[in-house]
Amino acid sequence: MAAFQKIKVANPIVEMDGDEMTRVIWKSIKDKLILPFLELDIKYYDLGLPYRDETDDKVTIESAEATLKYNVAIKCATITPDEARVKEFGLKSMWKSPNGTIRNILNGTVFREPILCKNIPRLVPGWTKAICIGRHAFGDQYRATDTVIKGAGKLKLVFVPEGQGEETEFEVFNFTGEGGVSLAMYNTDESIRSFAEASMATALEKKWPLYLSTKNTILKKYDGRFKDIFQEVYEASWKSKFEAAGIWYEHRLIDDMVAYALKSEGGYVWACKNYDGDVQSDFLAQGFGSLGLMTSVLVCPDGKTIEAEAAHGTVTRHFRVHQKGGETSTNSIASIFAWTRGLAHRAKLDDNAKLLDFTEKLEAACIGVVEAGKMTKDLALILHGSKLSREHYLNTEEFIDAVAAELSARLSA
């Protein structure tokens, strides 16, 4: 076969390297599936824990700022250190979650979506199409002030306006017994508006209907605000575009939406408040079969900046085997899709049809290989259960090699 004419990519992408087993497969993906085919300017940031520690986590902030500059980032899974990791790596500090830091700088909404393979059975067999879930990653319980109340007394909520104006006081509860618990949480109009814009942009790009779920019957003002802002944003900027694409936006009660989700066939974008999104994204991942088949894209309110990553962790258990020189069978599909989703966005921004075609062929190669029966151990286990034996699966590198061979065949077809 003649040497492949590399596809030129006009603008750079930001690459964020990561940790452990995912760092190992990341390099392999880059060397075998990306660099042989693309002429690409990569702005590289090492978000591996040792370098984050060395730079006092500045590298994480720099990588997020570069993302705002270049509009496309592709991220490998990273360790968020706990006490044990601080000891293991001899860290200067227990650094925060890089994903949290990046999310706060980009002010984005996280969208998760499963990768479907016909031969991998789903726990919810009715889900024949993907469901893309968007989680509002700001405020509510995650930025709340919660406290234990000891003894009797009044709990009040007070708002003191800046400058002129009267302060407002609400009596929340009168504790008469031995006390209890309390919680005060908030969100901002700006953040809800950004969430609405990102959700609508994602739905339009996919040409899928959009549902927002809240409990506005109980939280009439709090959740009512989400409902109202979404409706305003929809009417102002998206309604005509949605109608032209034959899709729609609808608000649903969270309990109705969960029931609908379970009996639906899929094929829509589900916008969730922070806590609901935290819970329901794991419900979807399990229902579709595997976190190893879950993509995650952070979409910014500017409509042009995204960061793509795998929805899973750094696969420490496999890395320990790899460190000892043992054979691993780690699923690289979600990490490959981080590259394809990021590059597909680059292609759309640059109007690069060849690059877009390449990303579609790489995704099809991954799915094609699995559907032809070549897969890693985690997927083979879903298929074969207790009857699983070594001939049913490929090891980490064999799988990436199989995808590379399939990709080359599709590109030369």
Swiss-Prot record:
The protein's role, per its UniProt record: May supply 2-oxoglutarate for amino acid biosynthesis and ammonia assimilation via the glutamine synthetase/glutamate synthase (GS/GOGAT) pathway.
Protein name: Isocitrate dehydrogenase [NADP]
One Pfam family this sequence matches: Iso_dh
Transferase as UniProt keyword: no
Organism: Glycine max
Principal subcellular localization: cytoplasm
Subcellular location: Cytoplasm
Cofactor: Mg(2+); Mn(2+)
UniProt entry tagged with the keyword Iron-sulfur: no
